[in-house]
Amino acid sequence: MVVSADPLSSERAEMNILEINQELRSQLAESNQQFRDLKEKFLITQATAYSLANQLKKYKCEEYKDIIDSVLRDELQSMEKLAEKLRQAEELRQYKALVHSQAKELTQLREKLREGRDASRWLNKHLKTLLTPDDPDKSQGQDLREQLAEGHRLAEHLVHKLSPENDEDEDEDEDDKDEEVEKVQESPAPREVQKTEEKEVPQDSLEECAVTCSNSHNPSNSNQPHRSTKITFKEHEVDSALVVESEHPHDEEEEALNIPPENQNDHEEEEGKAPVPPRHHDKSNSYRHREVSFLALDEQKVCSAQDVARDYSNPKWDETSLGFLDTPLARRESVALKGRTRSWQHSSHAN
């Protein structure tokens, strides 16, 4: 035989449970309040006992010495416990700040990783389109350069996003650039050194280089290297003649250079009639004949150089390539050599 539960009894039981639970909660709240009150009273009593113990210690009451020591000992322990709690609270605060900063850094790293994934995804997509072009003409020319530049920019953006210390790297790059600029400013300019070396090159070598370069620009001549070699050799002969002539006294050179072409014969006759300076009387006839023959040889070399230049010239050559044989200096030197040769001949015949 089964007995059915009465619904009214079940409701009463539930109501009793709720009432008992509520009553217990109220009692717990009252107990907590009483505990707080007792704790407060205990702290007040403890503070009062500590102050009284200090006063009794001042008066040196021997009767209450044990009580005073116990109170002071308890107070000292409580102070140590309080200091320990404060120290733990400070450490907890520091740890909390550290955890907060690490959480912030972790958030930034997650953001950087997300941006890095996006950039790598764009770079991968760009490289796929670059390596598999639809149009074959698109893989050449300006389009290829633009795509490569875009890929390079995306790669740099990815590296910049994933680098942990961007600011420090930028500062180091700026310092390196400043050091490079200072080194470049301190080092001598290569162009200035080259200009200084060019100033030290002799004039005859520059003329020789000009002749060789002017000949080398004409590709139609098959015998061009042979001709330039001969002209250079003749130029060396002319230079040697000029150097030997320049070793003579400076006053004779100026007199010979100042002779006009139209009055050359008159001046030669005057030189033949004029008396020989005393220093020429000291020379022997053999030495004069040797010097006259040497000057004649120099004159012959100059004339032969001019003849060679005329023989090897053709309409295709640049007229400026042999300009050094037709310069005013060369003409004046030739006139000076002729005048000096004839003056030596006149002086030798007069003796």
From Swiss-Prot:
GO terms for cellular component: cytoplasm. Its main location: cytoplasm. Expressed in brain and medulla. It is found in: Cytoplasm. Residues 174-261 form the Olduvai domain. It comes from the Eukaryota. SMART domains: DUF1220. Transmembrane segments: none annotated. Residues 10-43, 69-115 form a coiled coil. Residues 214-226 have a biased composition (Low complexity). Residues 165-179 have a biased composition (Acidic residues). Keywords: Coiled coil, Cytoplasm. Residues 192-202, 232-251, 264-273 have a biased composition (Basic and acidic residues). Residues 157-285 are annotated as: Disordered. It holds the Pfam family Olduvai. Belongs to the NBPF family. Encoded by one of the numerous copies of NBPF genes clustered in the p36, p12 and q21 region of the chromosome 1. This is Putative NBPF family member NBPF5. It comes from Homo sapiens. The gene is NBPF5P.
